Curated annotation (Swiss-Prot):
Belongs to the eIF-6 family. Pfam families: eIF-6 (PF01912). Transmembrane segments: none annotated. Binds to the 50S ribosomal subunit and prevents its association with the 30S ribosomal subunit to form the 70S initiation complex. This is Translation initiation factor 6.
């Protein structure tokens, strides 16, 4: 299933909301209509909490079904909320705090910013229980903003090379294709909310973009 909406006029949904196959994390002030759409499309429990005192869960977190990684600026009461819901969450040690911009992961692997420390990569590997590979894509290190990935497929920045697409496929273990969202926006990871059950994109997303998203994430086979 694919849904389209903007949050208060903002189509860059992947910055605001984090979604995996077992949970979606949203702002506590998110309107009921959005919550209903998220629940229907992604078919996961929803946790309402600020992250680092903000409404930017997607930018400040990354992870997969095994665990979540979070900015070191997280508040203790926010961690308590996540752990009360039995979420395995670990704090990242580095100064690169926009975790969602520098890590993209599914249940098969993780691609990360080459600037991450060895300690950070160890935490990622142990928390997510996957192989961790450093890379840039299309000349950029913000891999979490450049790739939207689930356990079905990965949509990648349109300037990615064939070699980079092959790497995404090898590490994440899913088919990868280039594409855009929101009428030509290349930072697909920052704009898409997705898990294996569905995808949510901004209202500006065009018909051809939706067709590519449907194909890449293999949504025609239905929910898991």
């Amino acid at each position: 299933m694919i849904q389209k909406f903007d949050i208060d006029g903002n189509p860059n949904l992947g910055v605001s909301i984090l979604a995996k196959d077992n949970v979606a994390i949203v702002s506590p002030g998110l309107q009921d209509s959005y919550l209903k759409s998220i629940k229907e499309t992604l078919n996961v429990p929803i946790i309402k909490t600020p992250i680092c005192g903000s409404n930017l869960a997607g930018a400040l977190m990354a992870g997969n079904s095994n665990g979540l990684l979070i900015s070191p600026y997280v508040f203790s009461h926010e961690l308590d909320v996540l752990r009360e819901h039995d979420i395995n969450v670990e704090i990242m040690p580095d100064k690169l705090t926009a975790i969602g911009n520098i890590i993209v992961a599914n249940d098969n692997g993780a691609l990360v910013n080459p600037s991450l420390s060895d300690e950070a990569k160890r935490i990622i590997k142990n928390t997510l229980e996957v192989e961790v590979v450093e890379t840039s894509i299309a000349g950029l290190d913000i891999v979490g903003s450049l790739v939207a990935a689930t356990n079905r497929g990965a949509l990648v920045h349109p300037d990615a090379s064939e070699e980079e697409l092959d790497l995404v496929e090898d590490v994440l273990g899913v088919p990868a294709e280039i594409g855009t969202v929101n009428r030509g926006v290349k930072l697909v990871g920052a704009c898409i909310i997705a898990n294996s059950n569905g995808v949510i994109v901004g209202n500006k997303t065009t018909g051809p973009e939706l067709a590519r998203i449907d194909q890449v994430f293999n949504l025609f086979e239905g929910s898991l």
